Amino acid sequence: MGESKRTEKTRVLVVGATGYIGKRIVRACLAEGHETYVLQRPEIGLEIEKVQLFLSFKKLGARIVEGSFSDHQSLVSAVKLVDVVVSAMSGVHFRSHNILVQLKLVEAIKEAGNVKRFLPSEFGMDPPRMGHALPPGRETFDQKMEVRQAIEAAGIPYTYVVGACFAAYFAGNLSQMVTLLPPKEKVNIYGDGNVKVVFADEDDIAKYTAKTLNDPRTLNKTVNIRPPDNVLTQLELVQIWEKLTGKELEKTNIAAQDFLANIEQMEIPHQAGIGHFYHIFYEGCLTDHEVGEDEEASSLYPDVKYKRMDDYLRMFL
């Protein structure tokens, strides 16, 4: 049933299309054969890279729709064009933090009344499991929960895509903070380095998102991205890199209390980052719960040949 449904063309609007994950979702939707629309907000007029991205989307076959979060009716008109809305609004402290702006999108979808599914901006840790998260990083999860509650209160059909660390931020650097490149000599290991973590290439996250958005099996469900070969400990990730380079790194184990020391004195974005790293690498928040095959992306869509972390790390050689 799911397979036949996904061969049909679905009209999709991507909001936040020029963002880090948004641009990948646009391309994945086009590759999946969806009739893809992207929301162009008037304020991007002087941002040359975003303008060029929109032009590249247009060249690939996407349709540009103008709309503004300060103009409710323009949002209603935009969502009336499509069956599915996917949001990729930024929700991290070191970039723009726009999670609650999605409430305006919820209102527009509610008024339009035609949208068959909404995928809000998620893609990371599962917010209902993060009520205990350290501030200020918890703000992201609290706000995502606020958006979820608004979606469900409005009776809008949904799919939540969660569960993985973006490889570019967590794998290429062997999970080191303050760099996106692999360390050359020394590597910090969180605790004993044996907590299981989920890594995923961002293009694969986008592919799974494009496949799940019209799949009846995932309607009103949470889809976890947990590709089995990419469920690794930090030590296993480091060992993959050491095998590729033929060089052993000097390892320094950092106890939890040392990792969190002086967090209150740090800048807010750094505090949030420390908190997220703590929950992932010390608590194991991505893997401390079971996920059924009908809830896991790589099981639902085995045709996606996801990138393993050894292949991912080869890019840095």
Curated annotation (Swiss-Prot):
It catalyses: (-)-lariciresinol + NADP(+) = (-)-pinoresinol + NADPH + H(+); (+)-lariciresinol + NADP(+) = (+)-pinoresinol + NADPH + H(+). It is an enzyme of class 1 (oxidoreductase). The keyword NADP applies. Disruption phenotype: No significant difference in lariciresinol content. Prr1 and prr2 double mutants show a complete inhibition of lariciresinol biosynthesis. Elevated levels of pinoresinol, reduced lignin content in the fiber cells, and a slightly altered lignin structure with low abundance of cinnamyl alcohol end groups. InterPro entries: NAD(P)-bd_dom_sf, NmrA-like, NmrA-type/Isoflavone_red_sf, PCBER-like. The active site is at K144. Pfam families: NmrA. Gene3D superfamilies: NAD(P)-binding Rossmann-like Domain, UDP-galactose 4-epimerase, domain 1. (-)-pinoresinol binds at M125, M177, V178. Reductase involved in lignan biosynthesis. Involved in secondary cell wall biosynthesis in fiber cells. Unlike conventional pinoresinol reductases that can reduce both pinoresinol and lariciresinol, PRR1 shows a strict substrate preference toward pinoresinol. Active on both (+) and (-)-pinoresinol. Abstracts the 4R-hydride from the NADPH cofactor during catalysis. Forms homodimers. Belongs to the NmrA-type oxidoreductase family. Isoflavone reductase subfamily. This is Pinoresinol reductase 1. The gene is PRR1.
